[in-house]
């Protein structure tokens, strides 16, 4: 075990002690969160159970890690696994002793939780199809993994004002959300020369902001200099006193964009003068053929790869919650088919890549009962209440109620978009960047406090056009399923 892992192992015993104090009400929710958040552990509502978030680097799931998660579900009788909106896995409803046991075992397998929460660099997001997507510029996977390694080697040393999110996209589709992160990179090329376009100081949640484009090309091998410069700027200019205004997006709002970019340049120059952070990775331009011979038709669960004859199957469980039994079925398939590769997405899905035609057919059949197939079925939702400590509304229940209403009334789902649902304004369900989004809250209506959701429309993410959704108003939670049903009928009439 290396020195860093030894430090992380020692932290687990401190978490164990703090967890028991919290359960016994000897320390507050805030005090416990201050200790546990940086370790990827949070108390659930009620104060007796806990959740753990694994730092599955950029969503890549090795066979060893798939097996490990499967074994955890069996040993600790975990019914469901949650795929998050940042390419990670969460396990819920665990006791603190079990949490600590899981962390120790995971550490032995290089599956980390450190930095899964708290004021640290979070999981580095990438396009889930990076390396196999038609039309991509180049595969960003190795660069993302190097950034993750760089972060993890220093994870216990960071003292940031708030969390820092980094994303890399392999094409202009911006599937990783580079244009809405603290630091984003999108693969590009000019005259056959690969480079990154860079974006700074964006983010979702309260007072969201689209990232600021950086007007210079970033050489792929130099990406760590730009990462380190942003960290240093964040430490120098971030707000350590007001948590509500501590994210990077508040810095250019305070300084002005021109001054912010000038300050960033100063930090970049200094980093380049003082450190050697060149990467020994070559960005190789991806090739997309003019013609392909795929026999299976594409749909929302099946994508043609740029490698002729190969497919990716997209498994989206309802609300990102996959039962442990269904997860095991997928894990067994991947273990039996060595060419298959699993990656988690930003949309609470698992992408199983590099499948030939026969393998794709088999996996589609295996997942048929639990794989959501239409856009509205593939809606996203954060965990919400009754699990989340800070959640206000039942986000997952809302999605279930919408689907039940549509199916009960035999309404066509064909024209409905996915809905992105957050249980509060924190945007864990990314409600601000979906075609339609909902954010939970409470509101007095007459003499009653009602369950309500703010409704947003028109959000989207891409290199050319990233838009934050417009808030239209607030709806009673009880009325939303019927509203979606009526919308479906109107869309069908207009053939949209």
Regions found by a protein language model. Give the residues of each.
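N-terminal basic/disordered segments at the start of proteins
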Residues: 1-65, 174, 185, 189-192, ...
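Mobile "lid/hinge" segments at catalytic clefts and subdomain interfaces of large enzymes
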Residues: 2, 158-262, 437-494
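Small-residue-enriched alpha-helical segments and adjacent helix-cap loops
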Residues: 23-27, 49-195, 225, 316-447
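Short, flexible, solvent-exposed loop/turn segments with mixed acidic/basic and small polar residues
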Residues: 41-46, 77-83, 237-241, 302-307, ...
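Short acidic (Asp/Glu) and glycine-rich catalytic loops that position anionic groups and cofactors
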Residues: 47-48, 126, 204-211, 239-246, ...
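Generic secondary-structure signature for well-ordered alpha-helical cores
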Residues: 74, 78, 108-111, 152-156, ...
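Terminal amphipathic helices with adjacent charged low-complexity linkers/tails
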Residues: 93, 97-98, 105-110, 235-299, ...
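Long hydrophobic segments that form regular secondary structure
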Residues: 303-312, 318-344, 480, 484-496
């Amino acid at each position: 075990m290396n020195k860093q892992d030894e430090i992380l192992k020692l932290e687990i015993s401190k978490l164990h002690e703090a967890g028991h104090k919290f359960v016994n009400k000897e320390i507050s929710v805030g005090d416990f969160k201050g200790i546990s958040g940086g370790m990827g552990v949070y108390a659930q509502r009620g104060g007796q159970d806990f959740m753990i978030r694994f730092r599955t680097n950029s969503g890549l799931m090795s066979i060893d890690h798939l097996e490990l998660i499967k074994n955890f579900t069996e040993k600790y009788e975990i019914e469901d696994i949650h795929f998050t909106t940042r390419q990670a896995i969460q396990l819920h409803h665990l006791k603190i002793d079990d949490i600590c046991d899981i962390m120790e075992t995971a550490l032995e397998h290089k599956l980390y939780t450190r930095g899964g929460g708290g004021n640290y660099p979070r999981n580095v997001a990438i396009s889930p199809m990076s390396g196999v997507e038609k039309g991509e510029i180049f595969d960003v996977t190795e660069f993302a993994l190097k950034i993750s390694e760089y972060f993890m080697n220093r994870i216990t040393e960071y003292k940031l004002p708030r969390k820092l999110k980094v994303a890399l996209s392999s094409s202009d589709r911006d599937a990783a959300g580079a244009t809405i992160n603290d630091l984003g990179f999108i693969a590009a090329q000019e005259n056959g020369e690969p480079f990154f376009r860079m974006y700074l100081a964006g983010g979702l949640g309260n007072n969201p902001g689209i990232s600021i484009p950086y007007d210079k090309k970033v050489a792929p091998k130099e990406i760590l200099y730009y990462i380190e410069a942003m960290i240093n700027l964040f430490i120098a200019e971030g707000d350590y006193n007001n948590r509500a205004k501590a994210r990077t997006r508040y810095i250019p709002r305070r300084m002005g964009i021109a001054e912010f970019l000038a300050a960033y340049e100063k930090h970049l120059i200094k980093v380049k003068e003082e450190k050697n952070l060149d990467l020994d990775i070559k960005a190789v331009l991806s090739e997309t053929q003019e013609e392909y011979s795929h026999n299976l038709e594409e749909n929302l669960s099946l994508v043609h790869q740029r490698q002729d004859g190969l497919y990716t199957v997209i498994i989206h469980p309802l609300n990102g919650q996959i039962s442990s039994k269904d997860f095991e079925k997928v894990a067994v398939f991947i273990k039996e088919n060595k060419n298959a590769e699993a990656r988690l997405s930003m949309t609470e899905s698992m992408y199983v890549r590099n499948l030939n035609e026969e393998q794709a057919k088999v996996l589609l059949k295996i997942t048929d009962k639990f794989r959501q197939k239409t856009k509205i079925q593939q809606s996203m939702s954060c965990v919400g209440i009754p699990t989340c400590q800070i959640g206000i509304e039942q986000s997952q229940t809302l999605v279930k109620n919408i689907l039940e209403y549509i199916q009960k009334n035999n309404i066509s789902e064909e024209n409905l978009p996915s809905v992105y649902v957050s249980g509060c304004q924190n945007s864990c369900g990314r409600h601000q960047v979906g075609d339609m989004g909902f954010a939970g809250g409470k509101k007095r209506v007459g003499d009653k406090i009602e369950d309500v959701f703010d409704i947003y429309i028109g959000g989207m993410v891409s290199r050319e056009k990233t838009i934050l959704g417009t808030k239209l108003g607030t709806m009673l939670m009880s009325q939303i399923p019927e509203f979606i049903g009526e919308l479906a009928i109107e869309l069908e009439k207009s053939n949209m």
